[in-house]
Amino acid sequence: IIDVHEIDQIMTCSVWLKQVWIDKKLSWNPEIYGGVSVLYVPYEMVWVPDIVLYNTVDSNYNITISTKATLRYDGQVTWDSPAIFKTLCQIDVRWFPFDEQNCHFKFGSWTYTEDLLNLELLDSDARYELEMNENGELNNITIFEEGIDLSDYYPSVEWDIMSRIAKRRTKNYLTSFSDEAFIDIIFYLELRRKPLFYTVNLVFPCVGISFLTIVAFYLPPRSGEKVTLCILILVALTVFYLLLKDIIPATSIALPLFGKYLLFTMIMVSLSVLVTVISLNLHFRRPSTHRMPIWVKWLFLRILPKILFMRRPTLIKVDEAVRRVADYRRGYNMIINRYEQKVNCDSCRNVNKRITQEIQKIYRSPHVIKAFENVCFIAQLLKKKDREAMIDEDWKFVARVLDRLFLLLFSIACFLGTILILFQAPSLYDTRQAIN
């Protein structure tokens, strides 16, 4: 096997075609001719059957390599002709790169019908079956399990030969006179691709790139590289698609196995871009622009964190003393009374009375009231910022929960998708040994 060109669907093989027939006109008596029993003559000098390769894609149907034929005294003619055949081989890309192909060589006479030329295989055990022809009639066919001699076969670096069946059958062809029967012999080659090259250079890199999609959900939103990573993965997969286009034929019969995996990976990456955009949108939401719905709080702040084993970090709260200062308008009198009680005692009632009056003057002065109002404003501002910070942290935590959720979902999807798509090729479970 020289080459199997998938795009052009052509198989090129170098073969030895051995043909043996009896020509009584070429027999002689060796005793009369000095004991000569074998002659070697150019094949052009003797009659040769017009055996042609029906499914060739070359312009020459006949064998054109000039070799000599062997003539034996009893009229047996043996012609071993080396040739390079280019045959049409319909490529089945469904399981690429773990595919198996069935190619064949169809030989037969172009001129002589069944009555004039009989074709048989040499030295091979045969079995007989019935096959239905185009007219719905049953014809006898002869099947040879070892139809091709592989004793001098040079193993291909890309393909293994799994079987080499030959079939002899009779088929009717419409000629200029009538519908006449011709005998043809078809040699079938079942080839299984050696997947190591494409596994290392295509499958493994693509699997690695697809699992990089999971890393995008592990990046913190503040890094700003989540969408960039997803887009780069998408570009890398596009390059793999271009490589695949140059390897397999442009057929619409079936989608290649590797193409299915690439399509699955591109869908996953596209979804990851969408989810990443949603996650970034949630992360950078502010209380002034968005109000968190109740169901979002219930689902993303209570239920999912427990399922995903996530713990929310403790927030730094405003000091309680500042909160009490914020309640100045409501508890201002309580503050004054508290300080008045501190300076009241029975032993120094007169002095305390004077001190209390001074304290009341101080606490009720416009400057002190203004200072308390300013402190109250600052406290309210701190309370508002603290509340907004808590809501802001809620949105960020929702984004983290969403990332963790899709990190888990995409990990499961990528793993199961890789197993279910790539491991469905039948050749991976074919335990037959290749024919060496």
From Swiss-Prot:
Spans within the Extracellular topological domain: 1-195
GO molecular function, one term: transmembrane signaling receptor activity
Pfam families documented for this protein: Neur_chan_LBD, Neur_chan_memb
Sorted UniProt keywords: Cell membrane, Disulfide bond, Glycoprotein, Ion channel, Ion transport, Ligand-gated ion channel, Membrane, Postsynaptic cell membrane, Receptor, Synapse, Transmembrane, Transmembrane helix, Transport
Cellular compartments annotated: Postsynaptic cell membrane; Cell membrane
Residues annotated as transmembrane: 196-219, 227-245, 261-280, 405-423
Main location: membrane
Disulfide pattern: C89-C103
Entry keyword annotation includes Disulfide bond: yes
InterPro entries according to UniProt: Neur_chan_lig-bd, Neur_chan_lig-bd_sf, Neur_channel, Neuro-gated_channel_TM_sf, Neuro_actylchol_rec, Neurotrans-gated_channel_TM, Neurotransmitter_ion_chnl_CS, Nicotinic_acetylcholine_rcpt
Membrane-topology annotation of the record: Multi-pass membrane protein
Cytoplasmic side: 281-404
GO cellular component, one term: postsynaptic membrane
PROSITE patterns per UniProt: NEUROTR_ION_CHANNEL
Entry annotated with the keyword Acetylation: no
Residues glycosylated per entry: N62, N140
Family: Belongs to the ligand-gated ion channel (TC 1.A.9) family. Acetylcholine receptor (TC 1.A.9.1) subfamily.
Described function: After binding acetylcholine, the AChR responds by an extensive change in conformation that affects all subunits and leads to opening of an ion-conducting channel across the plasma membrane.
Protein name: Acetylcholine receptor non-alpha chain
UniProt organism field: Onchocerca volvulus
